[in-house]
């Protein structure tokens, strides 16, 4: 079996005195798209933060075989992990174009960056029209797309997506997940997406983990989880 | 004996220690140093008030030195022009400064954060010029000299003060007066903080939007906080004038406002007990700095370095440290195992 | 009546006001850069600028030309600013804002004390950057020194603007100031962006100091204290989060203060600053975020 792209083993994470993850283990293989589901407070966002290094964590966290358990967020990004945070992290004072350019901060290949900007904008035509607009004036859906586009400018090997559906209308959510799926299938981009909206997430991913109170309660292929009535009712709310 | 009784016993012990310290401290130091202790008490009063405004209500003021000026000049003017006895001017000094504090609080309704700091800073910077301008009342650049123009109004000018049959030196008297008022002021502030008003202050500090949605009147709260901290500053200013027996524009420069803010933050925003340490810090640090060396610039360097080091080691002030230390103790006392 | 008014004098006083305002503007921009990145007003900015001016003096004293000393001082000041941020601000990066404010106050005394200790308290003078001859523009005599000061101030500010607007590092720096968490996630070392901000601010302060000193017959360690007050006032007037505002606010303030001093009798030199502050307060009460500041949006 090929080495997983991302591997977490017995990872704990805490916010000050409060422990949010109590030893979770998960993996994402090359080119795979995986969902992390669960109720509010289950530790989904914390899981992504543990990977990108924005929370105090311990345990084994390996990316491409190398440990990133002690790596600072800036270096994690440089290693090829793009984290689209909860709330999108839009740089509201900067223009759309500047947000994108910032995404490519770690890259040195200027020509390729320009090419990527065109390619990324082709996925998000709405953004292309708003190049010099201040990012703070975009709608919620557009900001989510911008956050995603900015992450892609990094040319990541793994994309961490935190609750992309939050606060967005169903049509917009569907559009975003369609794009995520396309990126995964067409470009082989590995995706780890955290979502409260289990329906949409399971449709767009191959495997899923369900978290409960900081631990992995259920794991399996998305198809299996969609079919499993018991799991759906107790963990996914439908 | 239950936990509750143990808690009460602890409080009684703490209060007893404080009162004993208050009563006997002057015996332990020379008469001259009682004066420094008194001045520490004066700072204590001012920064307790400033803490109510900045630490508990979240409003920044760079102008409390100017409020002390209002109090100090009220005292001096009453003594020199109206022949009031110095101690009796103190309440009025507080009141006048409270009113001015209220007026300063009015811009607070429109301005916040840095802009409020700017407004209070403008007041502090303008104060010496204003004092010089209205020389009829304030004695202009010369100031008012109570020693020359109102000697009969000075308590203890003869060197001894007799109260309730006890006689003591003038410096001791000033110490007892300052810290006596300080303890009373501390008690009042403590009661305010624990009361509904105190919760209102904290609500405004933590989130004005949330506070307004909860029905809190921001205008009233902010101006009240300014007014009450003004009263404290005014009382402190009046005491300072009483102690120095002179006031002039240089007594109350912008530097004083800074010193008060330093004392409050070092003591710990949102912590009243910490203010004791804050007061001693700003009172004694200049002396300590000069002790290190009197070469040009070195005292200032030491002074600034001490402030920086304290802030790096204790970012939430002494009060923050006290809270962190006391928390496990008090939690153990009040929670079931 | 219009013909009897002395337009020449007005024009001259405006230029003089712009020159003072220009000096304040460079320091004000320094304050804004630090405010945007660190969230505090650096009370030591003036003293750092003063220290830089003394370094310039030492260089000139050792044989450098004014402009040679000028640019070398800029480089040294930049390094100094970075060093100060790493040593003194970084440890309190996560502390409450007022704590950092107090640290900058401590820094004020540290830098001032250091300057007094290294250079004895006697007064010194810095040669003039520009000739002191007057120049004739459209029949009105202006001082080259004033015009040169305006040019250098605005030039420095413009260079800074170019840096922030058009370079990758400048972009990262701006982003770090707006949203440090998100900026970290794209690979920017946010902590170092802060240091960069302090370095640039120190360099701008140095410009301010080196333009202030030559205009005075002599200067000492108190050189920049009034300048800091005016710069702060100008920045607040323009809107503390807006560099453009800081520049325009300071220029306006410079002209206002000078015109008040010239034309209004009871505003002697005593009341110049308080009156200016009163005007600013008036403006703030109408526009609480300053002329160009963005009103703070409250997220409910």
PLM regions: where:
Chain A
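Glycine-rich phosphate-binding loops of nucleotide-dependent enzymes
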Residues: 2-238
């Amino acid at each position: 079996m090929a080495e997983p792209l991302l591997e977490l083993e017995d990872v704990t994470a805490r916010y000050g005195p409060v422990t949010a993850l109590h030893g979770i283990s998960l993996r994402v293989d090359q080119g795979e798209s995986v969902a992390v589901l669960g109720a509010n407070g289950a530790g989904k966002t914390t899981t992504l933060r543990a990977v990108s290094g924005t929370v105090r964590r311990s345990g084994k966290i390996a990316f491409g075989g190398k440990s990133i358990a002690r790596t600072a967020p800036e270096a994690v990004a440089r290693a090829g992990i793009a984290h689209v945070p909860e709330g999108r992290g839009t740089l509201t004072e900067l223009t759309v174009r500047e947000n994108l350019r910032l995404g490519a901060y770690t890259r040195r290949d200027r020509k390729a960056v320009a090419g990527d900007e065109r390619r990324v904008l082709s996925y998000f035509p709405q953004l292309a029209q708003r190049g010099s607009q201040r990012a703070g004036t975009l709608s919620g859906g557009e900001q989510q797309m911008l956050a995603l586009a900015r992450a892609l400018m990094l040319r990541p090997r793994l994309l961490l997506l935190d609750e992309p559906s939050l606060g967005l209308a169903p049509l917009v959510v569907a559009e975003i997940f369609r794009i995520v799926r396309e990126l995964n299938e067409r470009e082989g981009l590995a995706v780890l997406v955290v979502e409260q909206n289990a329906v949409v997430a399971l449709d767009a991913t191959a495997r899923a983990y369900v978290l409960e109170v900081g631990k992995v309660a259920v794991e399996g292929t998305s198809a299996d989880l969609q079919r499993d009535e018991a799991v759906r009712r107790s963990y996914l709310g439908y | 004996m239950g936990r509750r009784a143990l808690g009460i016993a602890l409080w009684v012990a703490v209060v007893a220690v404080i009162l004993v310290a208050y009563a006997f401290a002057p015996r332990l130091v020379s008469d001259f140093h009682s004066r420094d202790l008194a001045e520490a008490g004066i700072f204590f009063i001012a920064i307790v008030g400033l803490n109510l405004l900045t630490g508990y209500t979240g409003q920044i003021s760079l102008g409390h030195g100017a409020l002390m000026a209002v109090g100090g000049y009220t005292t001096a003017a009453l003594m020199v022009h109206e022949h009031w006895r110095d101690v009796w001017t103190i309440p009025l000094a507080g009141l006048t400064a409270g009113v001015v504090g209220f007026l300063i609080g009015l811009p607070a309704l429109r301005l916040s954060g840095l802009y409020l700091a700017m407004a209070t800073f403008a007041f502090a910077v303008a104060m010496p010029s204003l004092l010089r301008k209205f020389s009829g009342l304030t004695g202009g650049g010369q100031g008012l000299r109570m020693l020359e123009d109102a000697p009969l109004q000075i308590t203890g000018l003869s060197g001894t003060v007799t109260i309730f049959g006890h006689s003591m030196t003038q410096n001791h008297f000033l110490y007892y007066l300052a810290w006596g008022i300080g303890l009373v002021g501390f008690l009042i502030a403590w009661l305010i903080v624990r009361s509904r008003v105190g919760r209102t202050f904290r609500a405004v500090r933590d989130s004005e939007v949330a506070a307004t949605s909860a029905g809190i009147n921001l205008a009233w709260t902010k101006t009240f906080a300014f007014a009450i901290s003004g009263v404290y500053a005014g009382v402190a200013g009046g005491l300072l004038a009483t102690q120095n027996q002179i006031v002039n524009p240089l007594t109350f420069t912008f530097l004083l406002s800074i010193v008060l803010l330093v004392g409050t933050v070092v003591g710990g925003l949102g912590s009243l007990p910490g203010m004791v340490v804050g007061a001693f810090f700003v009172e004694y640090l200049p002396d300590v700095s000069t002790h290190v060396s009197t070469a040009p610039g070195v005292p200032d360097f030491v002074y600034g370095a001490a402030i920086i080091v304290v802030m790096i080691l204790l970012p939430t002030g002494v009060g923050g440290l006290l809270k962190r230390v006391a928390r496990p103790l008090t939690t153990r006392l009040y929670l079931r195992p | 009546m219009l013909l009897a008014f002395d337009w020449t004098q007005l024009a001259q006083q405006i230029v003089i006001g712009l020159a003072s305002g220009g000096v304040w503007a460079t320091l004000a921009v320094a304050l804004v850069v630090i405010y945007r990145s660190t969230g505090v007003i650096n009370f030591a900015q003036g003293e750092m600028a003063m220290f830089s001016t003394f370094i310039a003096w030492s260089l000139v004293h050792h044989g450098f030309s004014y402009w040679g000393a000028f640019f070398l001082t800029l480089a040294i000041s930049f390094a100094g600013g970075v060093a100060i941020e790493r040593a003194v601000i970084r440890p309190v990066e996560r502390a409450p804002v007022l704590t950092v404010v107090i640290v900058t106050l401590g820094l004020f005394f540290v830098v001032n004390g250091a300057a007094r200790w290294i250079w004895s308290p006697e007064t010194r003078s810095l040669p003039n950057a520009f000739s002191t001859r007057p120049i004739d523009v459209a029949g009105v005599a202006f001082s080259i020194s004033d015009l040169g000061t305006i040019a250098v101030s605005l030039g420095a500010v413009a260079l800074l603007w170019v840096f922030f607007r058009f370079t990758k590092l400048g972009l990262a720096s701006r982003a770090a100031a707006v949203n440090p968490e998100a900026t970290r996630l794209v690979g920017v070392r946010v902590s170092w962006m802060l240091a960069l901000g302090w370095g640039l601010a120190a360099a701008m302060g140095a410009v301010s100091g080196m333009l202030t000193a030559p205009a005075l017959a002599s200067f000492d360690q108190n050189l920049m204290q009034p300048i800091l007050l005016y710069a702060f006032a100008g920045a607040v007037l323009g809107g503390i989060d807006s560099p453009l505002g800081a520049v325009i606010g300071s220029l306006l303030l410079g002209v206002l203060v000078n015109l008040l001093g010239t034309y209004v009798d009871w505003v002697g030199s005593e009341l110049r600053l308080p009156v200016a502050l009163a005007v600013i307060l008036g403006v703030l009460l109408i526009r609480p975020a300053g002329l160009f500041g963005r009103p703070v949006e409250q997220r409910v």
